[in-house]
Regions:
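A charged N-terminal "starter" segment
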Residues: 1-142
């Protein structure tokens, strides 16, 4: 039986099913028995209490699924060779580089720091792109 958005996510029950604003929450989002928001098995109020706010929380399952969706869309709609590229400026971290690499994505970087972070996170150098202007000789050599 197929579940509707409403049955899967009662807190999104009033969203238009055709709206681009549907399913904005991570795929593991749920309400616990006390109607507290939970993502990836972690109650968000507990995370806020422990780490303070504002707090940026990512759901690994959602990141992995999104990476796969981009790769699959390119494979389906573009006959030539392609490589979906993660924009490291969104979150230049070892974990995000590792997740993107593990799902077959490439990565764009704007600095030596982003390149080094991606390499340390497991992103193969041949799947990285250095872009932007005003690059130092060291950054160009590293790329």
């Amino acid at each position: 039986m197929t579940q509707t958005i409403t049955s899967q996510r009662p807190f999104e029950a009033n969203r238009d099913a055709e709206s681009p604003n549907r399913n904005l929450t991570p795929i593991t989002t749920e309400l616990d028995g006390t109607d507290r928001l939970v993502v990836g098995g972690c109650r968000l109020s507990d995370l806020a209490e422990r780490y303070g706010t504002p707090l940026y929380v990512l759901d690994e399952a959602t990141v992995r699924a999104t990476c796969c969706a981009y790769r699959e869309a390119l494979n389906k709609h573009y006959a030539g060779p392609s490589l979906p590229i993660y924009a490291s400026k969104a979150n230049s971290s070892l974990v995000m580089s590792s997740l993107a690499a593990s799902k077959g994505l490439g990565l764009d970087a704007v600095s030596a720091g982003e390149l080094l972070t991606a390499l340390r996170g497991g992103m193969p150098g041949e799947r990285m792109v250095l872009h932007g202007n005003n690059k130092s000789d060291e950054e160009l050599l590293l790329a």
